[in-house]
Amino acid sequence: MDRLIMGKYDVSGIQIHDMGLAKYINLNSYFNLHTGGRYSNYSAGKRNVNTIERLLNKLMRTEKWTGKKYSAYRVLKEAFEIVEQKTKQNPVQVLINAIENSAPREEVTRLKYGGIAVPKSVDVSPSRRLDEALRNICIGATSKSFKSKVPIEECLANEIILASRNDGNSYAVSKKEEIERVAASAR
């Protein structure tokens, strides 16, 4: 039986190179990417939700897209078609590469020592790394399409492609580098 996402993209040959994220990237094949918060009451329930659906949910964060899952689904479907045309690769593999390249490995937290806040570098959990990567990919796409004639489908496709190439022009990759640079200075 083929493992297809959106009824079109095969996920059986997808390779995840980052072993820390491999346990948290879920590519169960669903034709309809809508679990309806089924896993929200379970600890670490996010692990059971398909990564593509989590990307859809991150797209619905702004006031323009709130509650419009079908519109977000249409945008993602068209973005995947653009990615497939431009790269001649499976867009799910390109997305996984983008997630691996834009997931920060360490960040800064604030510790208080006698009333003084001191920044301290800490490792990031794999679940948070995945959330940060998906969020930054979506923020980069929506910010580039805001007050622009370029449709969000193209912006999302370009953001995914740039992040998969580890290009500094990608919002997600530049944000990751910024977070890691601040963490390196706080060691």
Swiss-Prot record:
Pfam families: Ribosomal_S7
GO biological process: translation
Entry keyword set: Ribonucleoprotein, Ribosomal protein, RNA-binding, rRNA-binding
A GO CC annotation given for this chain: small ribosomal subunit
Database matches in PROSITE patterns: RIBOSOMAL_S7
One term of GO molecular function: rRNA binding
InterPro entries reported in the protein's UniProt record: Ribosomal_uS7, Ribosomal_uS7_arc, Ribosomal_uS7_CS, Ribosomal_uS7_dom, Ribosomal_uS7_dom_sf, Ribosomal_uS7_euk/arc
Entry superkingdom: Archaea
SUBUNIT field: Part of the 30S ribosomal subunit.
Protein role: One of the primary rRNA binding proteins, it binds directly to 16S rRNA where it nucleates assembly of the head domain of the 30S subunit. Is located at the subunit interface close to the decoding center.
Family classification: Belongs to the universal ribosomal protein uS7 family.
Protein name per the record: Small ribosomal subunit protein uS7
Protein source organism: Picrophilus torridus (strain ATCC 700027 / DSM 9790 / JCM 10055 / NBRC 100828 / KAW 2/3)
Upper classification of the organism: Archaea, Methanobacteriati, Thermoplasmatota, Thermoplasmata, Thermoplasmatales
